[in-house]
Amino acid sequence: MSDTEVVKTKADYLRDVTTQLKEMRHYAQTNTETLSSHWLAFDEGEYKDGEYAAKFDTLLNKQGKLLDDIDQAIQDLEITVNNLEQEN
């Protein structure tokens, strides 16, 4: 092991965060698809139950907002990384 610590540039750090957010977005999308299938089962399918359909609808809306917010954060970070790279 080395005693020297590697310090990342801000652009490198932001690039790492962007990669992590993209991975999180992938899993969030998968979760949204799972919630959607459960919602359909409660809303129109074989387990028709209005109360659960409403609960899953609320969860889907929140998950959709999370996906939108993650997408926006990714875009903002990518713009910042590009600007930092152009400055150097």
Kindly label every feature range from the protein language model:
Residues 1-13:
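Short, charge-rich amphipathic alpha-helices with coiled-coil/heptad character
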Residues 12-26:
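Short, charge/polar-rich alpha-helical segments
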Residues 24-27, 62, 73:
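Heptad-repeat coiled-coil/leucine-zipper interface motif in alpha-helices
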Residues 29-57:
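Short E/K-rich amphipathic alpha-helical oligomerization segments
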Residues 29-33, 67-71, 75:
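Extended heptad-repeat coiled-coil alpha-helical scaffolds of eukaryotic proteins
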Residues 44-47, 72-88:
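Long amphipathic alpha-helical coiled-coil segments
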Residues 56-67:
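Acidic, serine/threonine/proline-rich low-complexity intrinsically disordered regions
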